[in-house]
């Protein structure tokens, strides 16, 4: 299996590069390796796709963070597979601008002067999950707004009894040719905005747009293992195409609430588990919480604060690979704030055995007063020793 080149090296940017710097670097490489300007270079298409793959990761904050931490393994399966160069321009059209692909003659790739059919716009909704819902998967009711075909004109934009007419500027192609020095650039028609048609008598309800606002409500399935910042795609649930093409998609942006016990790190869960001094010193069998209920864990004698035990398979499933992470139990020894007299006595005996220096026993305030007014006599033998020294 061939080793992949570092994405930062592919785009020729530093690891600290900003999103804007990544965008500029990708545009530069896209122009350099575009197949239409490198017809005699068979490797140009491969380099173009390699740059696109690198850009798709480094331009996305979540994918970039996983790549920085785990390398290519962290984003395996997270990038799109593009059939041809035109698919790339469909995906990153906003970055290049409307006429970028046609600048290199991309229009001929779609059958000469045919008008390009555009997808409908994508929409978004926000979904908040508990950690348990994210781990197991769930069904959620979502509400979002989108534009749909006008129910009065059926999306034509024209009033009843009239029909859209062919655009006189572009001849129905949706695009026009503009000269820029020795270059001829094909761009979206400014008159019909790429639709290829003009509305003579607009619909009174939608005012010629062919769409109307809608509040969409649906129940969606959230797959197990999603993480904060991920997106769930609802294909075809976006807005309609202005050209009769496919609808856009709805993307559900996932937000996962913090848990009061567990902290998530990728597919692993981290739990800080308190145990007593006696349990740490002598060993114990304790019950630790998991998302599936209590789990029995054996703590060997002499366990130190900070030791981590791994409970296999009690983490979060990876929605791409299907592998399940682990529960990492981090031990810390909890020191009691209050001790009974017996507990204090036993601990002092232990300290004496270990030759540990500890604070003396507390003396009550009344004992201190009694000692102040009636101090104890000096120990016998102290005075005679001084006398002997004087002599």
From Swiss-Prot:
Binding of Zn(2+) 2 occurs at: 167, 170, 189, 192
Q: Where are the CXXCXGXG motif repeats?
A: 150-157, 167-174, 189-196, 203-210
Domain J spans what residues?
6-71
Q: Which cofactor does it need?
A: Zn(2+)
Binding note for cofactor: Binds 2 Zn(2+) ions per monomer.
Keyword list, A-Z: Chaperone, Cytoplasm, DNA replication, Metal-binding, Repeat, Stress response, Zinc, Zinc-finger
Kindly state one GO CC term assigned in the UniProt record: cytoplasm
One short Pfam family name for this protein? DnaJ
Provide the GO MF annotations for this entry. ATP binding; heat shock protein binding; unfolded protein binding; zinc ion binding
Q: Subunit structure of this entry?
A: Homodimer.
Q: What is known of its domains?
A: The J domain is necessary and sufficient to stimulate DnaK ATPase activity. Zinc center 1 plays an important role in the autonomous, DnaK-independent chaperone activity of DnaJ. Zinc center 2 is essential for interaction with DnaK and for DnaJ activity.
The molecule here is called Chaperone protein DnaJ
Give the source species. Rhodopirellula baltica (strain DSM 10527 / NCIMB 13988 / SH1)
Name the lineage.
Bacteria, Pseudomonadati, Planctomycetota, Planctomycetia, Pirellulales
